[in-house]
């Protein structure tokens, strides 16, 4: 497993525009090293015969069929509106003539 060096952490911090003290750089390189060790252990445990997945269980669509139901006519919809004009809803302007 490749080692995470302090210089690599410093380079990444610079790329991300993150200011880090010398102590933070040392701590972060050690923390990242531990994380990579754990990831490596998980990869080794999985083996080549395990199919990679994004979820531990299979997902399936649990939604109902998308079937159009009764719809309002244009007139029925506009009857409920406080104001309409030329077959469209009329609402107050909000952008001062833009």
UniProtKB/Swiss-Prot annotation:
Pfam families: GatC. One of its GO terms (biological process) is translation. Its EC number is 6.3.5.-. One of its GO terms (molecular function) is asparaginyl-tRNA synthase (glutamine-hydrolyzing) activity. Transmembrane segments: none annotated. InterPro entries: Asp/Glu-ADT_sf_sub_c, GatC. It catalyses: L-glutamyl-tRNA(Gln) + L-glutamine + ATP + H2O = L-glutaminyl-tRNA(Gln) + L-glutamate + ADP + phosphate + H(+); L-aspartyl-tRNA(Asn) + L-glutamine + ATP + H2O = L-asparaginyl-tRNA(Asn) + L-glutamate + ADP + phosphate + 2 H(+). Keywords: ATP-binding, Ligase, Nucleotide-binding, Protein biosynthesis. Allows the formation of correctly charged Asn-tRNA(Asn) or Gln-tRNA(Gln) through the transamidation of misacylated Asp-tRNA(Asn) or Glu-tRNA(Gln) in organisms which lack either or both of asparaginyl-tRNA or glutaminyl-tRNA synthetases. The reaction takes place in the presence of glutamine and ATP through an activated phospho-Asp-tRNA(Asn) or phospho-Glu-tRNA(Gln). PANTHER family: GLUTAMYL-TRNA(GLN) AMIDOTRANSFERASE SUBUNIT C, MITOCHONDRIAL. Belongs to the GatC family. Heterotrimer of A, B and C subunits. This is Aspartyl/glutamyl-tRNA(Asn/Gln) amidotransferase subunit C.
């Amino acid at each position: 497993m490749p080692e995470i060096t302090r210089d690599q952490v410093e380079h990444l911090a610079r790329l991300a525009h993150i200011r880090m003290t010398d102590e933070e750089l040392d701590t972060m390189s050690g923390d990242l090293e531990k994380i990579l060790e754990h990831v490596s252990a998980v990869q080794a445990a999985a083996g080549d015969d395990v199919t990679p997945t994004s979820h531990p269980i299979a997902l399936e669509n649990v939604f109902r069929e998308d079937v159009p139901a009764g719809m309002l006519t244009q007139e029925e919809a506009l009857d409920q509106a406080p104001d309409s004009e030329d077959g469209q809803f009329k609402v107050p302007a909000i952008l001062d003539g833009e």
